[in-house]
Amino acid sequence: MTVVREELELKARVENPDAVRKAILAAGAELMYRGAMMDRRFDRRGRLEQRDEVVRLRVYHPADKSPEWGVLGWKGPVQRRGEYRLREEWESRVDDPKAVLVILRHMGYKISLRVDRAVEQYRLGGATLRLEWYPAMDVLLEVEGQPEAIEGAVRATGLPRDAFLAESLPYFTAAYEERTGRVARVSRLKRRE
């Protein structure tokens, strides 16, 4: 039987990531990953964007210098479920992300968006929490899981509940630019690959 995977999440701007890290570790969170996380979104002539769908190759570069790996995924249109951002999501781990990149390019896909960040990913109960540091933008915290697990993780952070929004990265980059007057950068690269 095939089960549709639903991604429910919230994001928050974090002023003091050290305090959040300390709070979630004190609540029993377990560090699952630390290192670089590089996302490449693909499209063909804007067709996926028109349908609010995403094809993404995410590449993990662990801080401990162990071998990189990737995750190829598809995400359906954004929806809302109560206070949460919801998308259907299908992913598969890949051992050779460079080969996947070549395959996608040969299929006519081009990179439409790059997102590079250093991350720390934790597991707390049934929730995944990820602190994200971008090249030139606010630190963000993403919390993903089922509603009860998300709310428990949010409480563990010590941040106010109203800091967590059902918004995506463009919302936070625009808020950063409006608040600081500086251009946000979410990729290390300034040119097309």
Predicted regions mapped to residue ranges:
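A contiguous pocket-lining binding segment that forms or flanks enzyme active sites
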Residues: 132-137
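Long, well-ordered alpha-helical scaffolding segments within enzyme catalytic domains
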Residues: 151-164
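N-terminal strand-loop-strand beta-hairpin
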Residues: 1-128, 163-193
